[in-house]
Amino acid sequence: MKPGIHPEYRPVVFHDTSVDEYFVVGSTLQTDRTIEWKDGKTYPYFTLDVSSESHPFYTGKQRVVQAEGRIANFNRRFGQFSKDKD
């Protein structure tokens, strides 16, 4: 490999904020934030909204709250058109 053109590969702590889970994965991600991990070492830190710990495909759980909001919004906007007219 050509020296000096590849990003640094290092362990990074990822934090899934939706379920408050932390995990360390090797990555080339660049971040200025750091966190001290359980082993006493300091690692780069990156927050995630969704990961395999919280995504419905991997957990088998559906997030009904968001879907209910969309259905209610649709019914509020277009519900009057579906009423039976005598």
Curated annotation (Swiss-Prot):
Question: Superkingdom of the source?
Answer: Bacteria
State the signal peptide span: none
- Which key words tag this protein in UniProt? Ribonucleoprotein, Ribosomal protein
Q: Name one GO molecular function term.
A: structural constituent of ribosome
Entry's NCBIfam families?
Answer: L31 (TIGR00105), PRK01678.1 (NF002462)
Q: What does the sequence similarity comment in the record state about its family?
A: Belongs to the bacterial ribosomal protein bL31 family. Type B subfamily.
The identity of this protein, by name, is Large ribosomal subunit protein bL31B
Q: What is the lineage of its organism?
A: Bacteria, Pseudomonadati, Pseudomonadota, Gammaproteobacteria, Vibrionales
